[in-house]
Amino acid sequence: MNSAKLIDHTLLKPESTRTQIDQIIDEAKAYNFKSVCVNPTHVKYAAERLDDSGVLVCTVIGFPLGASTTATKAFETEDAIQNGADEIDMVINIGALKDGRFDDVQQDIEAVVKAAKGHTVKVIIETVLLNHDEIVKASELTKAAGADFVKTSTGFAGGGATAEDVKLMKDTVGADVEVKASGGVRNLEDFNKMVEAGATRIGASAGVQIMQGLEADSDY
């Protein structure tokens, strides 16, 4: 297993500077991570710097609340891809899920999948805000909507991935959809637990520390 190619090297803090973006790009190139995951404002720059590097550009849509309109999420997706994004991590409408408005949740995801035009779409369900049945339902809706991954967390809601949630999500979606664990994966031990539970992608700001087998002190 090439552990580096499971990692989306992530910097999503609102105060992120160009210097910090340069740093994670340089690290991603050095370690040959799967992608760099940045906010949409940094996508074009990251795409230019990562051109022909083999490292993908991942960005986030409706982030971190998931509470923007479906049309807004679709436009954000189209704009991001036009600017060079390879992968899209979107946040579901969490309130709609809790209301039982499952058609709205699925249509929201479907609109982003359509706007992504074949690019990889990962669906963040924010597990820390959901109970067991809601995690199952959100995972089912993600699969039904045609997304590629179901993802645990934004890292902004006070909790992150757990091995138990990852396993539940993977058991729900089966072989057709992959699972991304993010939030609180800070070291090699955390990384291995998530992979053993069924994750095939890890979102973390601690990619370098994971590769070096060291502890990191970041929440995402």
From Swiss-Prot:
Molecular-function GO term, any one: deoxyribose-phosphate aldolase activity
Pathway info: Carbohydrate degradation; 2-deoxy-D-ribose 1-phosphate degradation; D-glyceraldehyde 3-phosphate and acetaldehyde from 2-deoxy-alpha-D-ribose 1-phosphate: step 2/2
Principal cellular location given in the protein's record: cytoplasm
Cellular compartment(s): Cytoplasm
Pfam family, any one: DeoC
Disulfide bonds: none
Protein name: Deoxyribose-phosphate aldolase 2
Lineage of origin: Bacteria, Bacillati, Bacillota, Bacilli, Bacillales
Gene: deoC2
